From Swiss-Prot:
Keywords, sorted A to Z: Methyltransferase, S-adenosyl-L-methionine, Transferase
GO BP, sorted A to Z: methylation
Pfam name, any one: CheR_N
Protein task: Methylation of the membrane-bound methyl-accepting chemotaxis proteins (MCP) to form gamma-glutamyl methyl ester residues in MCP.
Cited InterPro entries: Bact_Chemotaxis_MeTrfase, CheR_C, CheR_MeTrfase, CheR_N, CheR_N_sf, SAM-dependent_MTases_sf
Assigned EC number: 2.1.1.80
Stated name of the protein: Chemotaxis protein methyltransferase
Length: 275
């Protein structure tokens, strides 16, 4: 039977490795998460134990194993239209405001996970175009993630009933999805055409991505150290067009991390505008 226990030292070494690779800080008591996320890789890579896997990952003996381990640790389930208010604010305030500039609107969904956020943004855009014909110029969404397997899933746009049931109304399911067989549904092409998925580690430079009008970076910063949070936020400030907006998760704040944004209360919810 494969051993799935790990020592405190192995956990500390792997934690340091993970933070160096993608900024995620595990803390002192997430051994259970490492075991649950990485145990399947022990069998996949034909290793004797989880300890062997962690040692190989930290030592850099197998690049494919390293990538798979980071991939497993950064994969998170998410919801459609999470918290609702960001998408209401997008439709009622941000899109009309940015559209007044009479140029293409560019939106970035950072750490897009399994695709629910960027596709929710795309659906919001299509609903806005239908409700207010002629309001919006061309709109494009860039969705990024560090996980190659998540990006592959996003591009396919196929979801099972469990995933579809997390925040997606029956009306939107009928409007924006088509049957994919085996109880699954696929995002329609008119939604997918709005989104370009690409790999991006938030620790790296964003300069080659260009400038955006709106950035969604929701429920991501909570995994980072204060130093990493500041780095990400300041880079995102540099990636916004003048007057651009940043949307964070409901429990996230900029306090003490950057002075490049001003808070905008939207009732409900808070967003941030580039100074």
């Amino acid at each position: 039977m494969t051993a799935i226990t790990i020592s405190d030292q192995e956990y500390r070494d792997f934690s340091r490795f993970l933070e160096s690779q993608c900024g995620i800080v595990l803390g002192d008591s997430k051994q259970y998460l490492v075991r649950s996320r990485l145990s399947p890789l022990v069998t996949k890579f034909k290793l004797a134990s989880l300890s062997d896997l962690l040692r190989d990952v930290v030592a850099g003996r197998n690049r494919e194993l390293r990538i798979a381990a980071v991939d497993a640790m950064t994969t998170n389930e998410t919801l459609w239209f999470r918290d609702t208010y960001p998408f209401t604010v997008l439709a009622d305030k941000l899109l009309p405001e940015v559209a007044a500039n009479k140029r293409p609107i560019k939106i970035w969904s950072a750490a897009s996970s399994s695709g629910q956020e960027p596709y929710s943004i795309a659906m919001t855009i299509l609903e806005t175009q239908q409700r207010k014909p002629g309001l919006l110029p061309s709109v494009s969404i860039t969705a990024t993630d560090i996980s190659a397997s998540m990006l592959e899933m996003c591009r396919a746009g196929v979801y099972d009933n469990l995933a579809l049931g997390r925040g997606l109304s029956p009306e939107r399911r009928r409007t924006f999805f088509e049957d994919a067989g085996d109880g699954r549904m696929k995002v329609k092409d008119n939604v997918k055409r709005l989104v370009n998925f690409r790999p991006q580690n938030l620790m790296d430079s964003y300069a080659l991505m260009g400038k955006f009008d709106i950035i969604f970076c929701r429920n991501v910063l909570i995994y980072f150290s204060p130093e990493m949070k500041s780095k990400v936020l300041n880079q995102m400030a540099s990636s916004l067009n003048p007057g651009g907006y940043l949307l964070l998760g409901a429990s996230e704040s900029l306090t003490g991390l950057t002075d490049k944004f001003e808070m905008v209360r939207c009732n409900p919810g808070i967003i941030y505008k580039l100074k």
